Amino acid sequence: MIKLTDEGEKMLRECAESLVDLFAKNRIVKIKAKVTSGLGEGRIFVSLPYYMEAFNKFLGFQPYPGTLNAVIYDRISMENRLLLDLSRGILIPEHKEPNRVLGSVKAFPASINSVSPVAVVIPTRTTHPKSVVELLSPHKLREKLELEDGDEIEIEVYL
């Protein structure tokens, strides 16, 4: 049995990220998912001044205050979602405030059903399982795409 230290695990993760980046340049991964309602937490966090400014700075758009959530339902899409964990993406750093720490967020440019700009966001602190994808856009995506819970969407993620 081999046991890795935290430092060793970090080094392996960085190596894996480098390999994914090397082989995934200009790659598009597709994720199929079904729209689902969230708990409204995305709205709360996206509306915080730090995140609103950071998303604008790092993603190039002022996001609608909320996320669209979708649940992955097939194996290939889940594998593509897990690939995002190994990819660098755009890192929005954590932010320390007097009473709390706002966690970092990894983001990827994307489109949904050919609509952009969109970003897949992966907060380091989340209550969602990996099968739930959170999406940001300057648009209220439910209205723009006329989506209801259970509707299927195709997300193209640009690595």
Curated annotation (Swiss-Prot):
Obligatory cofactor(s): Mg(2+)
Record-level Gene Ontology MF annotations: magnesium ion binding; nucleotide binding; riboflavin kinase activity
Textual note on the cofactor: Binds 1 Mg(2+) ion per subunit.
Biochemical pathway: Cofactor biosynthesis; FMN biosynthesis; FMN from riboflavin (CTP route): step 1/1
Enzyme category, top tier: transferase
Binding site for CDP: G38, L39, G40, E41, G42, R43, H139, K140, L141, R142
Domain of life according to the entry: Archaea
Entry's EC annotation: 2.7.1.161
Record's keyword annotation contains Kinase: yes
Positions of FMN binding: T126, E134
Keywords from the UniProt entry: Flavoprotein, FMN, Kinase, Magnesium, Metal-binding, Nucleotide-binding, Transferase
Coiled coil, from the record: none
SUPFAM superfamilies, per the entry: Riboflavin kinase-like
Protein family: Belongs to the archaeal riboflavin kinase family.
Functional description taken from the UniProt entry: Catalyzes the CTP-dependent phosphorylation of riboflavin (vitamin B2) to form flavin mononucleotide (FMN).
This protein's name: Riboflavin kinase
UniProt source species: Sulfolobus acidocaldarius (strain ATCC 33909 / DSM 639 / JCM 8929 / NBRC 15157 / NCIMB 11770)
